């Protein structure tokens, strides 16, 4: 189908770059009656970040050649003959080292072979084997019923007490339980049982390696972890194991550093773009390019998706600024003008806005139109109507929240979340990523519009991102003058304490993950990359908001991980 066939002609943009005439009325921003955001300046050196675009590691070419040889060796390991449990453990290690994308087909083939094997003696009475098999199969799109855990229950229907001593089995059960669906009560019981008992023994585990794995899992289960972040931690952890495979470890290090060098060049180019926009000089909004690049790597780290990361990071950096305009800086009249301009996707009327807000708006238009132009040039598809629609919907949601604040209206939790799962902004990034990666035979005006309509998969992604954001940021945002968040909405609606409200929101997180998990198995019109993007944006949020607001404020844990994931290569042995 012709990509232009059903597109509204009004959405066909005549020029990529918008140039506005700024009148004296828009010349200065009055600070009178504007709320202060009190954001700290970015702690990142943008000159250094820009230099990453041209940095060259001469050893990298040598490592790439060595990595290709090691890759074939690892492929042979995966396909080799071994005991079923050993095969599962190897696949688990390969995935945790961040190498799943290199061996996708081999892993799926081996897991299918184990799944179709009629023999169950090797796993049916072994909690570790049963749980590891369950998790790996579900992670890779092969459904296994929860009933496989029934054999580990006693006559009263509770998990057998002797399992409390099986720490490795408990750990595998714990990780498996996070792939449960709504209504899978057995997995809920497994989560509670394994969590309680692992917490009871975590300080007394004799094996240092197993003890570290348990504490790491209790802090963040694998299913909720971003693959790239997890790989950086696990590479160091795997190196400490007694039975480490040296060539597998070496390949993981090589691959991590090779991908990191690609990310560094991308980050350098993005830093240059950011400085050229001039928006890095605006002090009333957040400067979050580095955080957004980390988020982009959580969403999709694989080298072949550089254009997806580039668009996602640019849009997310602008979204943070637009969000701050609506939440704190702009007057209600200015916000209505801003929303109208975006809704029309026409800069007529921009002279009614202050200069600083106009700069953000124009950069937003120019960036979106450039992304749309690249889509048309590279894929023959006009994506601008869909990107513009996503921006318009987002700004309308922001405006609704601003009106709530200015009028003193207190929404119910349900009303807040219905608006908030879109105002969290990930629909825009997901729409753009869909346009960039969907197969051309399936990419139509209607299919792109469907993504914009927030179907169930996108809805769960938005809801989880919103809940994580609120758990990490609500107190600070309300202190800045932002609208009530989910925690405060629940407190107002029910009279609950803040502690009780937080526990309720955490419960909603677990329930929303169950809905997301089920979506991953349901018939979907989406190709695999897009499905993964939805889940991975949530994993990025989990990281940034796990211990507070690691997004708006560059906390030590976010900066340390950013340095280890993006800046500092993994040290190699001298002979490498």
UniProtKB/Swiss-Prot annotation:
InterPro entries named among the record's database cross-references: Isoprenoid_synthase_dom_sf (IPR008949), Terpene_cyclase-like_1_C (IPR034741), Terpene_cyclase_plant_C1 (IPR044814), Terpene_synth_N (IPR001906), Terpene_synth_N_sf (IPR036965), Terpene_synthase-like (IPR050148), Terpene_synthase_metal-bd (IPR005630), Terpenoid_cyclase/PrenylTrfase (IPR008930)
Cofactor(s) needed: Mg(2+); Mn(2+)
Annotated Mg(2+) 3 binding sites: 469, 473, 477
Residues annotated for Mg(2+) 1 binding in this entry: 323, 327
Catalysis: reaction(s): (2E,6E)-farnesyl diphosphate = beta-bisabolene + diphosphate; (2E)-geranyl diphosphate + H2O = (R)-alpha-terpineol + diphosphate; (2E)-geranyl diphosphate = (4S)-limonene + diphosphate
EC category: lyase
Pathway(s) this gene product operates in, as recorded in its UniProt entry: Secondary metabolite biosynthesis; terpenoid biosynthesis
GO molecular function, one term: terpene synthase activity
UniProt keyword terms in alphabetical order: Lyase, Magnesium, Manganese, Metal-binding
Cofactor note: Binds 3 Mg(2+) or Mn(2+) ions per subunit.
A GO biological-process term: terpenoid biosynthetic process
Motif DDXXD motif: chain residues: 323-327
Record: residues binding Mg(2+) 2: 323, 327
Annotated positions binding (2E)-geranyl diphosphate: 286, 323, 327, 466, 469
EC code: 4.2.3.112, 4.2.3.16, 4.2.3.-
Family: Belongs to the terpene synthase family. Tpsb subfamily.
Domain notes for this protein: The Asp-Asp-Xaa-Xaa-Asp/Glu (DDXXD/E) motif is important for the catalytic activity, presumably through binding to Mg(2+).
Entry function: Monoterpene synthase which catalyzes the conversion of (2E)-geranyl diphosphate (GPP) to (R)-alpha-terpineol and (4S)-limonene, as well as small quantities of linalool, myrcene, (-)-alpha-pinene, (+)-sabinene and geraniol. To a lower extent, catalyzes the conversion of (2E,6E)-farnesyl diphosphate (FPP) to beta-bisabolene.
Protein name: (+)-alpha-terpineol synthase
């Amino acid at each position: 189908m012709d990509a232009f066939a059903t597109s509204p002609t009004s959405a066909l943009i005549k020029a990529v770059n918008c140039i506005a005439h700024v009148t004296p009325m828009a010349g200065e921003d009055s600070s009178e009656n504007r709320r202060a955001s009190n954001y700290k300046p970015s702690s990142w050196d943008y000159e250094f970040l820009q230099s990453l675009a041209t940095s060259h590691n001469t050893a990298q070419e040598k490592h790439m050649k060595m990595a290709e040889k090691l890759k074939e060796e690892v492929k042979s390991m995966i396909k080799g003959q071994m005991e079923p449990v050993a095969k599962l453990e190897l696949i688990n290690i390969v995935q945790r080292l961040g190498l799943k994308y290199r061996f996708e087909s081999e892993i799926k083939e081996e897991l299918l072979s184990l799944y179709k094997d009629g023999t169950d003696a090797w796993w049916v009475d072994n909690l570790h084997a049963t749980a590891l098999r369950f998790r790996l199969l579900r992670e890779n799109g092969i459904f296994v019923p929860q009933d496989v855990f029934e054999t580990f229950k006693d006559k009263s229907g509770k998990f057998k007490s002797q399992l409390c001593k099986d720490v490795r089995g408990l750990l595998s059960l714990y990780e498996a339980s996070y792939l449960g669906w709504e209504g899978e009560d057995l997995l809920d019981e497994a989560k509670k049982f394994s969590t309680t008992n692992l917490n009871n023994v975590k300080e007394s585990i004799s094996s240092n390696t197993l003890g570290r794995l348990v504490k790491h899992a209790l802090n963040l289960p694998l299913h909720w972890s971003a693959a790239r972040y997890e790989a950086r931690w696990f590479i160091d952890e795997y190196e400490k194991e007694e039975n480490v495979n040296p060539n597998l470890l070496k390949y993981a290090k090589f691959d991590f550093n090779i991908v990191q060098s690609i990310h560094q060049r991308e980050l350098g180019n993005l830093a240059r773009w950011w400085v050229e926009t001039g928006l890095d000089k605006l002090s009333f909004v957040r400067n979050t390019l580095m955080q957004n690049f980390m988020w982009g790597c959580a969403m999709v780290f694989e080298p072949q998706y550089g254009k997806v990361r580039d668009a996602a990071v640019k849009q997310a950096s602008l979204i943070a600024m637009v969000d701050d305009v609506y939440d704190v800086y702009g007057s209600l009249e200015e916000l209505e003008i801003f929303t109208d301009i975006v809704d029309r996707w026409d800069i007529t009327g921009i002279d009614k806005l202050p200069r600083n807000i106009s700069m953000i708006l124009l950069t937003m238009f120019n960036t979106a139109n450039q992304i749309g132009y690249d889509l048309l040039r590279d894929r023959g598809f006009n994506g601008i109507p869909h990107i513009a629609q996503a921006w318009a919907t987002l700004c309308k949601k922001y405006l609704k929240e601003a009106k709530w604040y200015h009028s003193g209206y207190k929404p119910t939790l349900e009303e807040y979340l219905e608006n908030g799962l879109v105002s969290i902004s990930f629909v825009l990034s997901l729409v753009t990523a869909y346009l960039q990666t969907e197969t051309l035979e399936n990419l139509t005006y209607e299919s792109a519009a469907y993504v914009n309509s927030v179907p169930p998969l996108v809805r769960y992604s938005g809801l989880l991102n919103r809940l994580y954001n609120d758990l990490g940021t609500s107190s600070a945002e309300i202190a800045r003058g932002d609208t009530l968040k989910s925690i405060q909405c629940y407190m107002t609606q029910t009279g609950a304490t803040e502690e009780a409200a937080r526990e309720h929101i955490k419960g909603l997180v677990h329930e929303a993950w169950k809905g997301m998990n089920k979506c991953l198995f349901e018939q979907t019109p989406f190709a695999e990359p897009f499905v993964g993007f939805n889940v991975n944006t949530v994993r990025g949020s989990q990281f940034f908001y796990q211990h507070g607001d690691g997004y708006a404020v560059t906390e030590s844990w976010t900066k340390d991980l950013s340095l280890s994931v993006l800046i500092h290569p993994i040290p190699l042995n001298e002979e490498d």
